[in-house]
Amino acid sequence: MRKIIHVDMDCFYAAIEMRDNPTLIGKPIAVGGEAKHRGVLATCNYEARKFGLHSAMSTAQAFKLCPNLILLPVNMPLYKQVSQQIHQIFRRYTDVIEPLSLDEAYLDVTDSTACSGSATWIATEIRQAIFNELGLTASAGIAPLKFLAKIASEQNKPNGQFVIKPEQIEHFIANLPLKKIPGVGKVTAQRLMAMGLNTCADIQHMNKARLLEQFGKLGQRIWAFSHGVDERHVEPHRILKSVGVERTLQHNIDELAQAYVILAELYALLIQRLKTHCPTLSFSMLHKVGVKLKFADFHVTTLEKRGMLITLNSFELLLTQIWQRAAGREIRLIGLHVNLPETTESKTQVQMSLW
């Protein structure tokens, strides 16, 4: 079986800020946009989390919960630089690395000879090297399957690791709450609970067709993971599957005419981003577009359509249709995205550079 490590840095952006400014240690801090600009938190440290703060929370709400919060601006160039340094440490042990974001990655160490081939010791050494050389802590999960490695990395956070050995998989999965499965969000978890499904063992004893009927593609993933099946490999080059832009508005809007103006600006940015990330890709190959709205109550809705050209008119048509879902609610964010083709040629042309 494979030996997979999932490394997840602990409150990465905030940890870098505390490392570089020790006077922040022990105080509630967050990294994100200002409240007056309707910003949201990118991350926060554990002191701030004690007040109920979390990533993606509006900055205004964060200050209501924690009036003494220290808010710092996002310093992306610095975070990318540190991420590259972490990546260099990974390379000492394996070249099979799949970055998920600046602070998170899968490593396949199946063929590594480091630490006598022990994935557990490799994870320990990586975490120690990150701390010794960069002054940051990381958590890690070690398992034969990708989704289990990711779940394991959350078991002993912060600054810890957890191992799921091959002979432990069956027992671990049987007792695993379904809400822990990657891709199962709050709403899906509630739907599963309403059906009397709480753990993977419950899925193992139910009819597969019923699950697929209720949850479609996600149901297939839930079924597979609940039976200990995850055939995904660690991919050294993650493929860029979509390109998108979005904007949190300075003020909520409730009129479609206002949204059209913002849509036109976002469309120009989307075309620019497509040309940057996919310089050799013909727009005629793109036929699936989407529009996203976030309401004032933070609920999100998305509408995607196939067979549409990448034109402003296409996005205006989708916006008109999705606007009906607002049902009188104000809009705080508008987003556009384009799904990229899944041909071999396009995959070689378009790759993520997260490190």
Curated annotation (Swiss-Prot):
GO terms for molecular function: damaged DNA binding; DNA-directed DNA polymerase activity; magnesium ion binding. Gene3D superfamilies: 3.30.70.270, 3.40.1170.60, 5' to 3' exonuclease, C-terminal subdomain, DNA polymerase, Y-family, little finger domain. One of its GO terms (biological process) is error-prone translesion synthesis. Its cofactor is Mg(2+). The gene is dinB. This is DNA polymerase IV. It is found in: Cytoplasm. Residues 4-185 form the UmuC domain. Poorly processive, error-prone DNA polymerase involved in untargeted mutagenesis. Copies undamaged DNA at stalled replication forks, which arise in vivo from mismatched or misaligned primer ends. These misaligned primers can be extended by PolIV. Exhibits no 3'-5' exonuclease (proofreading) activity. May be involved in translesional synthesis, in conjunction with the beta clamp from PolIII. The lineage of its organism: Bacteria, Pseudomonadati, Pseudomonadota, Gammaproteobacteria, Pasteurellales. The active site is at residue 104. HAMAP family: DNApol_IV. NCBIfam families: PRK02406.1.
